[in-house]
Amino acid sequence: VEYGYQYLVDGTIKIGDPYATKILDPWNDKWINASVYPNLKAYPAEYTSDIVSVFELNPAEFNWTATSYERPAENSLAIYELLVRDFTEEGSINAVTAKLDYLETLGVNAIELMPIQEFDGNDSWGYNPCFFFAADKAYGTEEAYKTFIDECHKRDIAVIIDVVFN
């Protein structure tokens, strides 16, 4: 079960939790395709405005399968930097996962994801993050991100995440 919450500062300012791992955005979530993020919790417009933080009680455990992964030596990295939004037509982490065999044939042993943290809007390179611990829902679910990492590790591909602390 997921719950939404906000902090009320000085009785008038509503803000999301800066440490939240998921947020609801009244302006941008409506543009997220249900095939990319199925069952996205609806924004509680009848109760509030601005960003709402989300937490989940007893989330399902992810079953990591690439348990013997070892990262490549730093001096042997062949890094492919990509922006999830532009790498495929769908612009989702699931679509990137579907292209891992192709990247592997190129000799890639590390993928650097351009920023994937939540940022203002859905059309940006992500260098304007606003919630550093929340992966961008426009690219997919938390499980989809974990599946991507697990599938990379099955192929001995490291995952590097580009972060910007503005």
Language model segments and positions:
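The feature marks proteins involved in alpha-glucan
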Residues: 1-79
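Short amphipathic alpha-helices and their capping/turn segments at secondary-structure boundaries
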Residues: 67-68, 97-107
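Extracellular/periplasmic catalytic domains that process cell-envelope and extracellular macromolecules
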Residues: 71-76, 104-106, 153-154
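Hydrophobic faces of well-ordered beta-strands that scaffold small-molecule active sites
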Residues: 78-82, 111-113, 159-161
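The substrate-binding groove and active-site-proximal loops of carbohydrate-active enzymes
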Residues: 80-94, 128-142, 158
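Aromatic-lined carbohydrate-binding/catalytic grooves of carbohydrate-active enzymes
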Residues: 102-146
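Conserved beta-strand->loop/alpha-helix structural units within folded catalytic cores of enzymes
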Residues: 103, 146-164
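Aromatic-lined carbohydrate-binding surfaces of glycoside hydrolases
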Residues: 119, 163-166
